[in-house]
A protein has these predicted regions:
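Serine/threonine-biased, Pro/acidic-interspersed low-complexity stretches characteristic
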Residues: 5, 28-29
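Short, low-complexity interaction segments enriched in Ser/Thr/Pro/Gly
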Residues: 1-2, 20
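Short, flexible beta-strand-to-coil junctions
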Residues: 21, 473, 680-683
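Bacterial N-terminal signal peptides that target proteins for export
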Residues: 2-13
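C-terminal segment of classical bacterial N-terminal signal peptides
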Residues: 19-26
């Protein structure tokens, strides 16, 4: 029966997405693959991806892909040319495979055309028939900082046998603090890009960011986890980008003014991006970019488009072409990254693009986020007019078609944590000591002399932590580690010292520097784009679109919140806010990034004290506290460490700030119930290169709850 079903499968067409096609002249046996991925699945097609290169003798290489419903590839195998791996895409290959059966599991792998080298095997599932009564089982998270490689938690995701995973941004970090991974060249300056800084060329951006994506797929320990390779192969994925894919400076604001010419989008490389890198974020005149074509947008600049292209090279993303919106210059001619996909009769998944069109992230004179009245400007946008109209119509159409659950992926939170334009005054928060101390290594031996400098040479710096105290012969009092250098063999200290080779240094733990999220930053909807946020939520409320769940990451904590809006549009007046009916947000993650690592005390009592301090401060400020305590249809609340979770439904039952985590969402047959389960591990230290530990730090269900649909 299985064979008969597979025989009916045929590849109707295969679209090559590998840049230029080259004649292959390389010795295929020397080619190596670093990972496979599949993504953007529909009912009938999917994107498959790999990278293949002969590192010793790089040259274009033709690559085949094999598809089968047999995981052993012993039966029913279809083989065809996927494309050519070459330098224009940093040797990545993508192919769009069509003609698949709906709601079916497939396996795939890549080979050189002579069959001498084969990649690992990947797995994906196509979306079920949009009218079928199908259960849906998916997960999401984001934020993978090289400081936390090899991303131990990510290795556990494939065991969940997901229909798909939503990788919600910050799929790499451009920063320099990760051992063995130097920083990228600068992409500009914040808040004023006119300040002279070394500015990357096109080739530098392409090479630097390609390297960062590659490193997300390579092991950091001998015979260790291949970072995100097992994760990508384990299920099909959807992907969004956020600030770190765009360099975390002015390019993160695709809809902001380019600041002069858009840079070299034409001409001969290397291009110099001294222009087209933005404007002064402190100047309120730049808060809204005119949408009449008079001012060029950052999303048209050479730097932005280079970073966007590298992101697409390294993700299994369907290339949907350029948007035709002549009445919307902000959007017209940009790559379409946003889309919606129906998963059976009861679920629609919507993936938005929250970076390409957004207005500038506003700054104060002191270079802090300006989240005050400037954020209430009704002309400011995060999504752009074309995407916002599309999103609203997509939600309306889905609701009118009877789709029960509407999941909207956004890369930045849309809930409200702190008072408008300000921060919470926490009530009885944990002390620094209660968060715990950092750094378990107590001594280390120098392997080189330090002659009145601030650089100490040792065998390895893996596992050392900034802030640890250092003492020993030649070390001044009150010396601490100030930086872990990327060479993996040196660290910096805060004092000059003369230390001989072979000296044993004593190390003391570092105090925690954890700072809770107590406000809505300028990157968030509430902190920087309040009017458009309000318009979207008002549209949902006014049209009685129920069972809407926003999915977000980027705050490096897991929390669940109801959403409030101002029916009369008074976005700067807290008293005007009311709840959006049957609508909430899940903020998830990180899968492996900083923030949670600054908490080493993982006790339930510590997390409860922190959650209570935030919730009490929110109540004092007339804000809705963390959690879903009064949400209609809420039942079966579970929380690790809290046997009374379903009875009390406290803020801590919907909150995890100290873990690496992802959330699994299940919609059962009939679409009546949504189940949300947070899975995670205790956070680990930066640059510790910690592998998954099933004995001492096993994945656990942190919390879970069920929501009954309405009506």
């Amino acid at each position: 029966m299985i064979m008969k079903k597979f025989v009916s499968f045929r590849v109707l067409s295969l679209t090559l997405i590998a840049g230029c096609i080259f004649k292959t002249t390389s010795a295929d046996a020397d080619v190596s693959f670093i990972g496979v991925a599949a993504g953007d699945a529909t009912t009938t097609d999917v994107i498959v991806w790999t990278r293949a290169k002969d590192e010793a003798n790089p040259q274009p290489t033709a690559i085949n892909v094999q598809i089968s419903q047999d995981p052993t590839f012993n039966t029913g195998v279809t083989t065809f040319l996927a494309g050519t791996a070459g330098s224009p895409t940093d040797y990545t290959v993508k192919a769009n495979v069509n003609g698949l059966n709906s709601g079916a599991i497939y396996y795939y792998r890549f080979q050189t055309t002579d069959g001498s080298v084969t990649s690992n095997v990947g797995k994906f599932k196509t979306a079920p028939n949009p009218t079928g009564d199908a259960p849906v089982h998916f997960a999401f998270s984001g934020d993978c900082d090289g400081l936390i490689r090899p991303y131990a938690l990510a290795s556990q995701v494939p065991a969940k046998n997901l229909d798909f995973f939503m990788f919600d941004g910050d799929t790499e970090y451009e920063t320099s603090a990760s051992i063995g991974s130097p920083a990228v060249h600068s992409t500009g300056n914040i808040p004023d890009p006119t300040v002279t800084v070394p500015t990357a060329t096109q080739s530098q951006l392409f090479d630097d960011f390609s390297r960062k994506y590659r490193q997300q797929l390579l092991p950091v320990n001998v015979d260790g986890q291949n970072c995100l390779q097992p994760f990508f192969a384990g299920q099909g994925n959807y992907t969004a980008y956020d600030n770190h894919e765009l360099g975390n400076k002015q390019y993160i604001n695709g809809g902001a003014p380019a600041g002069g010419g858009v840079g070299s989008t034409t001409g001969s490389p290397p291009f110099d991006f001294a222009t087209g890198a933005g404007v002064d974020a402190r100047n309120s005149a730049n808060d809204v970019t005119p949408n009449d074509g008079s001012v060029p947008f950052i999303n048209k600049s050479g730097g932005f488009q280079t970073l966007q292209q590298v992101f697409e090279n390294y993700q299994p993303i369907k290339e949907r072409g350029l948007i035709n919106a002549p009445s919307d210059p902000r959007t017209n001619g940009t790559r379409q990254l946003y889309f919606a996909q129906q998963w059976g009769r009861h679920v629609i998944f919507v993936n938005t693009d929250c970076r390409t069109y957004r207005d500038i992230r506003m700054k104060t004179a002191a270079n802090a986020d300006d989240t005050g009245p400037r954020a209430d400007n009704p002309n400011r946008t995060m999504l752009g007019a074309t995407q916002l109209a599309w999103l609203e119509q997509t939600l309306l159409d889905a609701d009118q078609a009877g789709t029960t659950w509407k999941f909207i992926n956004i890369s930045d939170p849309i809930d409200e944590i702190g008072p408008i334009g300000g921060s919470l005054a926490l009530v009885n928060p944990p002390t620094t000591a209660e968060y715990g101390t950092l750094g378990s290594i107590t001594s280390i031996v120098t392997t080189g002399s330090t002659n009145n400098t601030r650089t100490v040479t040792v065998g390895t710096t893996v596992g050392l932590v900034v802030g640890q105290g250092v003492s020993g012969t030649g070390v001044p009092a009150n010396t601490t580690i100030s930086a872990i250098n990327t060479d993996g063999a040196t660290f910096s200290i805060n004092n000059n010292a003369t230390i001989a080779t072979g000296v044993t240094l004593a190390l003391t733990p570092a105090p925690s520097t954890y700072a809770p999220v107590t406000s809505d930053g300028g990157k968030s909807w509430m902190g920087g784009y309040r009017a458009e946020r309000n318009a979207l939520l008002k549209f949902i409320a006014d049209n009685r679109i129920y069972n809407v769940v926003f999915l977000a990451t980027d705050d490096h904590q897991n929390r669940i919140n109801e959403l409030l809006y101002s029916p009369n549009g008074q976005t700067g007046v807290q008293a005007s806010y009311v709840k959006v009916p049957y609508c909430f947000e899940i903020v998830c993650g990180p899968l492996g990034a900083t923030g949670p690592d600054l908490i080493s005390n993982h006790s339930f009592s510590l997390v409860k004290k922190l959650a209570d301090s935030i919730a009490n401060a929110q109540l004092a400020a007339n804000l809705e506290p963390i959690g879903l305590a009064g949400y209609p249809g809420l039942h079966q609340v579970r929380r690790l460490g809290d046997p009374q979770a379903d009875a009390l439904r406290q803020p801590v039952d919907f909150y995890s700030p100290d873990t690496f985590n992802y959330n699994v969402l299940d919609v059962g047959n009939g679409g009546k119930t949504l189940t949300v389960t947070s899975y995670g591990i205790n956070s680990t230290v930066q640059n510790g290169f910690v592998e998954y530990d099933p004995v001492n730090n096993a994945e656990q269900a942190l919390f879970s709850f069920k929501i009954q649909r309405h009506p």
